[in-house]
């Protein structure tokens, strides 16, 4: 069809494509608007042009304009009003324009939720709801939801013979609570609501488990996902082998490897001819691949060591890839994979019915309370607009009313919203009146169940000439950014985005082209700052690796120093209003990050550089001292019999007791509640402390009475006034922010009391629920938009904004894979997937469906993260700075060099799909930039043609660990001495300080001995003593080392963490029979499903070493005497101090605590066995040398174990052994020798 676009006026500043978007009509229109392409201006102009054209006979209330946020809707209405006023100014007698200005306030310019609310208020009777309903906030909705769900589960538990429900509980919950089931129902409810018919989606979810008529996995609806994954990984294995062959073919390369490598490649290439219709054939083909032993090189000096190692490395990578394919997809027989799904069907059916019951109960409860939540709006509007799957009379009226429906940010629409929009637009394809604007490259709200495929489907079916289902118009000119920013973005994303991985091709239509005019200025090149965090590896079992936190600190300092440098050097920024350059200001700079976890470190780094800073953080509110103190006080007012909140209040500035006074109170009544001790102390003691307590108790009683009589806000304000706490925090550092936080607490209590919940008790429970669920409210905002500060925000928060200088931080932060590795997976196409739990055998298996959905979700996550990175880079107007830490730049750059020989512009699919962080993409893309080739001096790099200007800096972490300003400030006294200037040392407190400093405690030795010590700590202490000296006290205790939480245990675990993982597995291994490799692999899988071990821990476990143990004499003895074996035996034992420290003459005892790995307890004797994961092989000349060191290292530990177990059990410890997994070494310890 012809587009009938009127000619563009010669004086028009619009581009041809923009003009086309403004004028196109006669069919549905999709405008694919790239970042900074002026889409909002185009949308507003299109609307105004239609309204001022009197021949079009269009009124503003005949348009439906849908925006993504309320702020966008308000801006849209303002800009349309301004345009109409300008048109009226040029034609003041126009009755039509006067009518449009009058009608503007009645026009449907809003978010889709607001439009749905308008439908419901107007047609409430069609939905059978009370017209006086109140719209509630998400927090109140979640409180009602929790109550309803708890009630539903309680009801189900009370039904007799409810076998299906109890089987579901057993299959999907832990041993201690039904919290997992609670969470699962809630997640399924939310997920189902993104579908136009939630109940139909839940029923379809069950059908995916009906495999009675399916004879092969290849017939499963999600088999294409499996096929795609296998093909991708096979192709990656092939690429690994090609790289290995390339190294073998190099001069001085390991040519003898070629025959073996080429044979490997032939086998892999043969897989491209696979028979995909037969799962059995697939399984056999994969499992029959035979990697022959690689030949031994004679005369190794003839070969380049680097080429040899690289060839081996790539071949090993190919072998590992093929092994992973076999493990992930073919570890179970086909018939078992299908039967697992059929066995799960009853549970899924029960789960589906339970979610439907909850949905009905939840809505009924809201109806009884006269409330609706945001989720209800779309579905109730849909109910009004639909009648037997067709447009209702109401919908048809809207179709007649709206001459055009315009949607902004269309890429973030979900299926429910799409259905609503379809029902209010012209149903005729030939006369479509839907105008959609968006950019699928900026679709970053999949976590809100946005569906970018809706945009992509239209993008692929609509044609630029209008001949398809609609008209497609591409806006690729960018009017926001300098050429340097656009070149950098294009260079990176040409290599990253395609339909296969990113769900869209980054072709010439998608590329950004220059539309803005900036004066030429130097130093605007994109900067890539990489901070090398390389540290020496530690191997001993008891040492901890450096904390992950240091990365954030170093990166934050680097960014702060960069900003300080730009400010001091008056970095030039082009001012569009002044139309000239000016020196950079703090407000010109934004720091973007995927998450705000580094915000505290960033704030600290900015303080050191004296940079005003503001982090747009939505967390940390409840952790602030002033809010935590007030919450504790409110808990005590609600119920004083809560020891921890009461102690917090007493210790706080509100009461001001110290630790000694708290101890005295506890001694007044050693057992029972602390509040009873408080009352007892008050009654039996005459002191200043007792007076404080008496005043507090009286005050507390008054507040408790007030909480019953008055509302919550009155109570809070009364506390502020009576305690002067509000004024007190105002005098502390950051007082303005602290007072804002207390005002926010008052305001939030006021909001809470407007809900259907009331009273102090419920408010306290409400706050506790928020804290448990991690729904922090964020600290109160004290800065305005125009404050001259450096800002930090998430990439999501920055969408739609623009800044002169953008610093993208945290690029090496790992992607959040939590949802993908969750026990249960939800998918819009295939419903629900999880492992199969055999309730009788207590065994957990991954299902074929779970594996497939996991791969699908992983691909979707990768595509989403790629789009998030695109949003980050396109926020910059003039300068883009990319900052990241790397664990070891030399090793990291070698990994990037693997793609340096690629001649195709697009990076290999596996390289992009396996990325773990943004730096994986940026590094692999920029390695082919001429700047990197020059930096690394690597001839193998195949650079890509580009105009991108890139400055690369590699810095070491040591450059940022000591701040120069801090050091200079601390050295001022030394400068005074050098210059013969006086250094003030006189003080009125000098004599008092000297008296304290010279005081000697008579029993000082006791202060250096802990009342409680672990055996491991004692072992460390003694191992630090000189071997020839007498036993002496250590003057410093070892720093307490806490286990890193699982989410901080990255790819490389510390030696301690590896030891913990090995011990955990040894504790769980069955002794009923000698375990096989398959037994251990299945056990590890079960432990992962139960969150006992993580994937990283499991990869660190050496299964062969465990199997070797059970081949050893100790292992065989344990199997033979399995009924006598006890594992992980904890003990506590009081030991005289003099036995530990010979030079200390004290009549004191120390509590020794420890855990024995294993012991065999017979009738009269006990044998101790302790496992060790110390590195032996390759570290010592032989076992004799190692044994001597190990006996010295662990003698104290085993001696104390033996003494404690002997004293506690009354049985003699006949023998004690150390077993070293590395090398299968057994070492007997003589426990009769002294300490």
From Swiss-Prot:
Domain UvrD-like helicase C-terminal, residue spans: 509-800
EC number: 3.1.-.-, 5.6.2.4
Reaction it catalyzes: Couples ATP hydrolysis with the unwinding of duplex DNA by translocating in the 3'-5' direction; ATP + H2O = ADP + phosphate + H(+)
Signal sequence, renumbered to the chain: none
Domain of life: Bacteria
Stored Gene3D superfamilies: 3.90.320.10, P-loop containing nucleotide triphosphate hydrolases
GO cellular component, one term: cytosol
Alphabetical keyword list: ATP-binding, DNA damage, DNA repair, DNA-binding, Exonuclease, Helicase, Hydrolase, Isomerase, Nuclease, Nucleotide-binding
Keyword DNA repair: yes
GO biological process: double-strand break repair via homologous recombination; recombinational repair
Cofactors (names): Mg(2+)
Record domain UvrD-like helicase ATP-binding: where: 12-482
A GO molecular-function descriptor: double-stranded DNA binding
Binding site for ATP: 33-40
SUPFAM superfamilies membership: P-loop containing nucleoside triphosphate hydrolases, Restriction endonuclease-like
Family listed: Belongs to the helicase family. AddA subfamily.
Main function: The heterodimer acts as both an ATP-dependent DNA helicase and an ATP-dependent, dual-direction single-stranded exonuclease. Recognizes the chi site generating a DNA molecule suitable for the initiation of homologous recombination. The AddA nuclease domain is required for chi fragment generation; this subunit has the helicase and 3' -> 5' nuclease activities.
PANTHER family the UniProt entry points to: ATP-DEPENDENT HELICASE_NUCLEASE SUBUNIT A, UVRD / RECB / PCRA DNA HELICASE FAMILY MEMBER
Name of this chain's protein: ATP-dependent helicase/nuclease subunit A
Gene assigned in the entry: addA
